């Protein structure tokens, strides 16, 4: 069943790690605008399924997978995170993907920096353009404000509470302009203990987003 009513369809997904079956014919259909939760005990294969959806290297370096993935009605092969991001898929991982010595803005805008021309640009072209920190700060602050996070984007990530780091990961995905599907691999596990009220408010905000 290939239907553009569905943003993602995963059919008969199978995955083994070194001969050990992890996924055995999993099907997942998500309509546009829906919110789904995958429930299961540790080792059930939830993260593996999400890694397949986001094209993580660990999947393809261990023999790939079997089955079909359809995104917005089109059969596709998501062979890398870049492919996933180009389709409009974002993912917040269990493990932090932030650079501690960078500011919040630098982490949110990493590999998506905004450039502006300067006096050398007409002669040297795009390679002479400089980073537009003002615009990047403004856009990053909007993402933080959307989550109700009271932080300044110029702050360094290093030393922030664990819960804040997870919010920054979420803000990074929200900031992507072509975002069509957002995947969370247990991102609130560390936040529930440390920041229950903020976590609940953020989840409500994301459900409206």
Language-model features and meaning:
Residues 1-209:
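Glycine-rich phosphate-binding loops of nucleotide-dependent enzymes
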């Amino acid at each position: 069943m290939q239907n553009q009513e569905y943003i993602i369809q995963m059919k008969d997904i199978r995955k083994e790690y070194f001969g050990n079956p992890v996924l055995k014919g999993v099907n997942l259909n998500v309509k546009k605008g829906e919110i789904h939760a995958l429930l299961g005990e540790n080792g059930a294969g939830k993260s593996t399924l999400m890694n397949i959806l986001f094209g993580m290297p660990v999947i393809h370096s261990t023999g790939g997978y079997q089955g079909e993935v359809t995104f917005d009605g089109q059969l596709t092969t998501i062979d890398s995170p870049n492919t996933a991001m180009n389709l409009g898929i974002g993912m917040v991982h269990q493990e932090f993907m932030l650079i501690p010595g960078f500011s919040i803005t630098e982490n949110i805008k990493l590999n998506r920096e905004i450039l502006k021309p300067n006096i050398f640009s007409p002669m040297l072209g795009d390679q002479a353009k400089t980073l537009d920190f003002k615009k990047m700060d403004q856009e990053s602050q909007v993402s933080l404000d959307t989550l109700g996070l009271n932080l300044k984007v110029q702050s360094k990530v290093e030393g922030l509470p664990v819960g804040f780091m997870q919010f920054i990961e979420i803000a990074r995905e929200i900031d992507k302009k072509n975002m069509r599907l957002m995947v969370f691999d247990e991102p609130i596990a560390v936040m529930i203990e440390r920041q229950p009220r903020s976590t609940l408010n953020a989840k409500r905000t994301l459900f409206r987003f």
